[in-house]
Amino acid sequence: MRRPMVAGNWKMHGTRASVAELIEGLVKQALPGSVDIAVMPASLFTSRVIEGLQGTSIIVGAQDAAIQAEQGALTGEIASSQLADAGCKLVLVGHSERRQLIGEQDEVLNKKFAAIQASGLTPVLCIGETLEERKAGQTLEVVGRQLDSVIAEFGIGALVNAVIAYEPVWAIGTGLTASPQEAQEVHAAIRAQLAKENAEVAQGVRLLYGGSVKAANAVELFSMPDIDGGLIGGASLNADEFGAICRAAGN
């Protein structure tokens, strides 16, 4: 049985004061022991968050990593080996904001995926379609292509030590969300695509939903058979809301 996961992506938010307040709120939460829980702060707060969450079950990840695992001459970048040394456990790769706004292509994302795994960290591979692609009926084609890029490069076995997050781009930060049935349809298609390569891997890979998940809709979303938790954006910046989402995943 797949263990649920809830991961909070803090994105480019936080000051020293607000991060300290958020840590304090998270420490007070009654969190389920049956759920893997992670937060991904902006990198300059990584050490502060890891230290503040010591003694809790919450692990800390990163929102991005460089195209190479080791340190080197890449100004402004952070190597996955440095993230591992700092205490991170997982790293986002391919988030829609980096695909859409930064222009990261599959070739770059594959290098990051490999570097993250080479450093002993877990990549959280984000895939999803835009509103235009959904309206054109291209959802499954788009997410399938994004997933195929990794499988073609590394083989299905690379996903044994990875998490996949389906995030419909049109539902991120907009307040819109796919219905539980719509989200389940895509998650089921993703798992079916994986099963064509290896049924055992397909059944073991955790598929998170990442489109405006809130405490109010988490229970229904997480009740779907192929939704194994959530990649949480704005709601993860509120400790009480995030705690409620985590508890929903544990039900």
Curated annotation (Swiss-Prot):
A Gene Ontology molecular function term of the record: triose-phosphate isomerase activity
Catalytic activity: D-glyceraldehyde 3-phosphate = dihydroxyacetone phosphate
Gene: tpiA
Subcellular compartments: Cytoplasm
Transmembrane domains' residue ranges: none
Active site: 95, 167
Binding site for substrate: 9-11, 173, 212, 233-234
Family to which this protein belongs: Belongs to the triosephosphate isomerase family.
Keywords recorded for this protein, A-Z: Cytoplasm, Gluconeogenesis, Glycolysis, Isomerase
One annotated Gene Ontology cellular component of this protein: cytosol
Quaternary organization: Homodimer.
Principal location class: cytoplasm
Superkingdom of origin: Bacteria
Entry's EC annotation: 5.3.1.1
Enzyme class, first EC level, given as a word: isomerase
A GO BP entry: glycerol catabolic process
Pathway it works in: Carbohydrate biosynthesis; gluconeogenesis; Carbohydrate degradation; glycolysis; D-glyceraldehyde 3-phosphate from glycerone phosphate: step 1/1
Entries under PROSITE patterns matching the protein: TIM_1, TIM_2
Function: Involved in the gluconeogenesis. Catalyzes stereospecifically the conversion of dihydroxyacetone phosphate (DHAP) to D-glyceraldehyde-3-phosphate (G3P).
Entry keyword annotation includes Isomerase: yes
Signal peptide residue numbers: none
Name of the protein in question: Triosephosphate isomerase
